[in-house]
Amino acid sequence: MFKRGVKIEIIPAIDILGGRCVRLFQGDYAQETVYSSDPVGTAMRWQSLGAPRLHVVDLDGAADGQSVNFELIKEIANSALIPVEVGGGIRSMETVKKLLVAGVDRVILGTAAVENPELVKEICARYADSVAVSIDARNGKVATRGWVTNTEIDALELARSMKKLGIRRFIYTDISRDGTLSEPNFAAIRDLISAINVPVIASGGVSSLSHLRLLKDIGAEGAIVGKAIYTGDLNLKRAFEDLS
């Protein structure tokens, strides 16, 4: 059984679009802010501050349905001394293998979980400890294909079905909070943790130490921090010292 509330893993996000490190507002590709033209250097910066893991998203891949920034991701994975998890455009067994062979520690499935559950089952059978499913939701309903396509699939229903297929870890993102510096959807995250009783990583709107403390208290295994560490709203080093 998953043990809750002991500590929380704080995971810096590196979102890559056009080879640059960017942040989007609520997942909108038309509302991007470029923070660095050197994603590898950014990864090394977060590692030097004490990051236990890096969360890398291939935004081009998420939109195109295939890995676009593979060479850059490979360079990050090979340069980092900490585990690197990757999402965005991972919709085939071939892409999963390619990323894991390249040194990626964990692959994250999003669209594939909705559109190809048989593939998820096959991936779990071979790489159960190296895969997570990202539940990306608007008003409790799952969005796919780079968050552009809305569905009527309930987030909790998807999580339950993926757990039955062998998924042992989930990432939950409330799209309306992502990139807003508001706050996470604590209620939805709490409900998901209670419903599936496996590790859940929270994402979207995490922007303060108090957010991280509350996420730890409700049982989140980890929290992905994005815009707040780029704007300076969240002091990453202090967060690691206080909560890791």
Swiss-Prot record:
UniProt KW Electron transport keyword: no
GO cellular component, as recorded: cytoplasm
Record: active site: D15, D136
Gene Ontology biological process: L-histidine biosynthetic process; L-tryptophan biosynthetic process
EC number(s) on file: 5.3.1.16
Main location group: cytoplasm
Record's keyword terms, sorted: Amino-acid biosynthesis, Cytoplasm, Histidine biosynthesis, Isomerase
Subcellular location: Cytoplasm
Highest rank taxon of the organism: Bacteria
Classification via InterPro entries: Aldolase_TIM, His_biosynth, HisA_bact_arch, Isoase_HisA-like, Isoase_HisA-like_bact, RibuloseP-bd_barrel
Top EC category: isomerase
Pathway assignment: Amino-acid biosynthesis; L-histidine biosynthesis; L-histidine from 5-phospho-alpha-D-ribose 1-diphosphate: step 4/9
An annotated Gene Ontology molecular function: 1-(5-phosphoribosyl)-5-[(5-phosphoribosylamino)methylideneamino]imidazole-4-carboxamide isomerase activity
Catalytically driven reaction(s): 1-(5-phospho-beta-D-ribosyl)-5-[(5-phospho-beta-D-ribosylamino)methylideneamino]imidazole-4-carboxamide = 5-[(5-phospho-1-deoxy-D-ribulos-1-ylimino)methylamino]-1-(5-phospho-beta-D-ribosyl)imidazole-4-carboxamide
Pfam families with a match to the protein in the record: His_biosynth
Keyword Cytoplasm: yes
Annotated transmembrane regions: none
Family the UniProt entry places it in: Belongs to the HisA/HisF family.
Alphabetical list of HAMAP family matching this protein: HisA (MF_01014)
Record's protein name: 1-(5-phosphoribosyl)-5-[(5-phosphoribosylamino)methylideneamino] imidazole-4-carboxamide isomerase
